[in-house]
Every structure is written in structure tokens, then in C-alpha cells.
């Protein structure tokens, strides 16, 4: 069931971030992504509280990404990891270029 829950939310040309809103790392990751202007439908925030039991979901994250923690961030169906991974990309000034290359940003 966790696999279906996650896979239904992942799509090409979309950024998906799985969060827990009480998590400070999740809020920080959302702050980074909120600097960008996404096309409609190209960015989805998924609260992991929507899935029970949460441990099953975290087990599936570990299986497909190597990590159980949130945030879990996907560009298309590819995991880029968590907050520290995205922060590193952002600090290299590469995040905007990556998001542009996958076609999720507004161009105007």
C-alpha cells in the first residue's frame, strides 16, 4: 500500500516533496522550493500523515531512496534525497537550473 501511495504521487515533470509539517527540516525545504515559481500541477506537497501506518511509508522510502526521514524530495520519479541534499544543490546555485531543465518552472 505504501508503494501505491507514493507512486501515485510521482510523475515526470513534477516535483513532489513528502513532509511532516511539524518537522523543521521539512519547513526549511519548503522555504527553498517556495523561492521558485512552478507551473500549475508541477509541484506537490504530500503530508505523510495522510498515510497510516507511517512506519510502513518510511520503510518504503528507505527501500527506494536509502532514507526513512522526511522531507523526501523527488524530481520526477528520481529521489534527490532530503533537505541537506537539496540545500547542497541550492548552495551551488544549481537548483534553479535543474528545475528549469525538467520543465517545472514558469517561464514568464
From Swiss-Prot:
Record function comment: Has thioltransferase and dehydroascorbate reductase activities.
The family this protein is said to belong to: Belongs to the glutaredoxin family.
Species assigned in the record: Camelpox virus (strain CMS)
InterPro entries, alphabetized: GLR_AS (IPR011767), GLRX1 (IPR047185), Glutaredoxin (IPR002109), Glutaredoxin_euk/vir (IPR011899), Glutaredoxin_subgr (IPR014025), Thioredoxin-like_sf (IPR036249)
Coiled coil: none
Swiss-Prot/TrEMBL keywords: Disulfide bond, Electron transport, Redox-active center, Transport, Virion
Keyword ATP-binding carried by entry: no
GO cellular component entries: virion component
GO MF terms held by the record: glutathione disulfide oxidoreductase activity
Location in the cell: Virion
Disulfide partners: 23-26
Residue ranges of domain Glutaredoxin in the record: 3-106
Name recorded for this polypeptide: Glutaredoxin-1
Principal subcellular localization: virion
Gene3D superfamilies per the UniProt record, alphabetical: Glutaredoxin (3.40.30.10)
Induction of synthesis: Expressed in the intermediate phase of the viral replicative cycle.
PROSITE patterns, per the entry: GLUTAREDOXIN_1 (PS00195), GLUTAREDOXIN_2 (PS51354)
SUPFAM superfamilies reported for this sequence: Thioredoxin-like
Keyword Secreted part of the UniProt annotation: no
